[in-house]
Design a protein with these regions (language model features):
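Conserved phosphate-donor/acceptor-positioning beta-strand/loop module used by diverse small-molecule
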Residues: 62-64, 93-114
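Short beta->alpha linker loops
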Residues: 3, 41, 65, 105-106, ...
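A generic structural signal for alpha->beta connector loops
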Residues: 57, 97, 146-149
Length: 166
């Protein structure tokens, strides 16, 4: 989770997801601070990676973007939507994705895969209910703008999904 692509964005992401936020940590950010760190990392990614690529008229593919912040922070964790919307509006300007692919997953299977991961971060430890809320949020976002979103069944072979996207 979280924006990547620049050293600064990576450092912010690591601050959010890595070990000192585990259950035994004495230092925890509140939800707004957590979200603002994600948004700061996203801004860095936009300024240093996306805007230069857009200027050069390159095709851009992002692993996660603004919909992830809405799904995870707003719908999953209950962060104030107007806060996220305001910051997104400020940092994005007129930038918006042309297409978004959402991979619909079987939550139980996804949780099993997370359980088997060798290196975990705090997002790997959230409840099934959290992931149900996040997936429902992605699907809700997709329903609102069906021209931009494509929901794909992630239970299919990854080669089939790749061919569908391409």
């Amino acid at each position: 989770p979280g924006p990547r692509g620049t050293k600064t964005a990576e450092k912010k992401r690591e601050a959010i997801v890595e070990d000192y936020f585990h259950a035994d940590s004495k230092e925890k950010f509140n939800q707004d601070t957590d979200t603002l760190l994600y948004l700061a990392a996203r801004n860095q990614h936009i300024e240093k990676k996306l805007k230069p690529a857009i200027f050069k008229k390159k095709i851009i593919i992002c692993d996660r973007f603004i919909d992830s912040t809405l799904a995870y922070q707003v719908y999953g964790k209950g962060v104030n939507k107007s806060l996220v919307d305001s910051v997104h509006k400020y940092i994005l300007g007129n930038i918006k994705p042309d297409l978004t692919f959402i991979l619909k997953v079987n939550i139980s299977k996804a949780l099993q895969r997370l359980k088997n991961r060798k290196r975990k971060n705090r997002y790997d430890r959230f409840s099934k209910n959290f992931y149900v809320k996040v997936q429902n949020a992605f699907l809700k976002i997709a329903r609102k703008n069906q021209n931009r979103y494509f929901v794909l069944d992630n239970s299919k072979d990854s080669n089939v999904i790749e061919k569908t996207i391409l």
